């Protein structure tokens, strides 16, 4: 796992905090933040209409943050989601989403694996 410098980590945490506020306005209930497994981390786990949403938050100013979600990152997320579900509720319906924060604006991309 890569270690982030404090400034980068603080920026990421701030983006995640803002993302939670945005998601709440869309009717999401925050379940958990920064869930870790041996495979990686899920930034936000939220519930909406009975579906768990595993949300990767990416922020950036001088580039399109969606490109930071690589196929390798998705594989790690899926393994981490399996760990979460095995511990909490293996029968939950779920989807994987990305929340892009760029220049103070939010864009929620749902079901990014399809």
Swiss-Prot record:
Pfam families linked: UPF0102
InterPro entries per UniProt: Restrct_endonuc-II-like (IPR011335), tRNA_endonuc-like_dom_sf (IPR011856), UPF0102_YraN-like (IPR003509)
SUPFAM superfamilies listed in its UniProt record: Restriction endonuclease-like
GO molecular function, one term: nucleic acid binding
Coiled-coil annotated spans: none
HAMAP family on file: UPF0102 (MF_00048)
Family: Belongs to the UPF0102 family.
Protein name: UPF0102 protein jhp_0762
């Amino acid at each position: 796992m890569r270690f982030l410098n404090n400034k980068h980590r603080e920026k990421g945490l701030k983006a995640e905090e803002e993302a939670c506020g945005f998601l709440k306005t869309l009717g999401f209930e925050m379940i958990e933040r920064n869930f870790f497994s041996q495979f990686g981390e899920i930034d936000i786990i939220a519930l909406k209409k009975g579906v768990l949403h595993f949300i990767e938050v990416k922020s950036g100013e001088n580039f399109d943050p969606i490109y930071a979600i690589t196929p390798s990152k998705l594989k790690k997320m899926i393994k981490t989601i399996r760990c979460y579900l095995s511990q909490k509720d293996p029968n939950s319906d779920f989807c994987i989403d990305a929340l892009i924060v760029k220049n103070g604006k939010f864009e929620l991309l749902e079901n990014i694996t399809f």
